[in-house]
Regions:
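Core catalytic lobe of class I
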Residues: 1-186
Length: 186
């Protein structure tokens, strides 16, 4: 991995990274610079008040909101999301099972239509206080309502993605493996 330093409103590198607020129109417009994305893989906050199990106990901003605040946040997030993608964009949205109905409702209010639920099956479960330990994460595959989606896969793709989770979360408390993004692009 690479380490980068960013300050608010920085846009750096070939991968277009913005340190900003994905719910603010001006930040998203600065990031996209008039362009529209044909494919997006995103991992918005799950609103589960996550605290990492490492010594530094990493947390995630906007991950402990009230129901009303979270729905408002997700509505703003998906409204901005819709503005920066082409009508035929392929969309992948990681989300928490606990907020699935609200996430889907926010997507639909923004004109984003879920097509299928992908399940990322990890090689090990996540420790927590729940009765059942999560060994998977759901990912919506979606498109813009009323438009066909760009499809990057072949006809052998399926809805179960078995990929190892990163062995350490040094950059983000709930890191996703590069391999699941690669699968979305394949």
């Amino acid at each position: 991995g690479h380490e980068f330093e960013y300050t608010r409103n920085d846009v750096k590198g070939a991968h277009i990274v913005l340190c900003g607020d994905s719910t603010k129109k001006e930040d998203v417009q600065r990031l996209m610079n008039g362009q529209l994305a044909d494919m997006v893989f995103t991992d918005p906050p799950y609103n589960v008040a996550y605290v990492g199990g490492t010594d530094d106990e990493m947390t995630i901003k906007n991950d402990a909101m009230s129901e009303e605040q979270y729905i408002s946040f997700m509505d703003a997030f998906f409204a901005r999301y819709r503005e920066c993608v082409s009508d035929n964009a392929a969309l992948y949205i990681c989300h928490a099972s606990a907020w699935q109905m609200d996430t889907e409702a926010s997507m639909r209010r923004a004109g984003i239509e879920p097509r299928v639920q992908i399940v990322w099956v990890k090689n090990t479960f996540a420790w927590g206080f729940g009765r059942y330990k999560f060994r998977h994460e759901p990912i919506f595959y979606a498109h813009i309502k009323g438009h066909p989606d760009n499809w990057y896969g072949d006809n052998t793709q399926n809805t179960v993605w078995e990929e190892n989770k990163p062995s350490a979360n040094r950059l983000h408390p709930t890191m996703k493996p590069v391999e699941i993004v690669e699968r979305a692009l394949a």
